[in-house]
Amino acid sequence: EDMLYRMFGIDAELLIDHAWGRETTTIADIKAYRPKENSISSSQVLGCDYDFEGGRLIAKEMADLLCLELVEKGLVTDSISLYVGYSRRLQKKSAHGTITMPVTTSSAKKIMGYTQELFEQIVDRNAPIHRVTLAFNRVVDEMYQQYDLFTDPAEIEREHKIQKTMFEIKEKFGKNAILKGMNLEKGATTIERNRQIGGHKSGE
């Protein structure tokens, strides 16, 4: 053993345990493990001031696109943060808040619902909106996906397959190859943003 420690240092302990069939990671260690936390986000400075309804539409579009990013990367989240900046004319303090979902998911249906709920909780209905930033916090591998009592796992799996198919179509034929009804509403920005790369028009 002394020779192994001289040759391999602290790794020698792992080699010795392995040789004797010992598992150095205990059940307690596994239960105590917490995956590394990350986040993904999206931000828009709007071309003109939006009213409450228009701002809510923008937030939902952003949530939908971030959900596709989760699916693409095999990730899930249980926390959403929203920042809304008002028109510069108002000199009004920005609105911001965070909502924690009872599930860990990449479901666009669920996440857009909670994004809308958060938007309605924190945003002044009478103040024109100029900037929206949305972030998904505590983003982890989809192996940590969790359901609540009101979730049908089969339905979530069907939605996940649809989202994955949508992503593949967009990758192959362009981001505007498949759209949702909200993307065609007045004030929606997804189509225009999809035509841009790094904030500049892509020439499509």
What is the predicted function of each stretch?
Residues 1-128:
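DNA-contacting surface of Y-family translesion DNA polymerases
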Residues 97, 101-204:
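Acidic, metal-coordinating catalytic segment for phosphate/diphosphate chemistry
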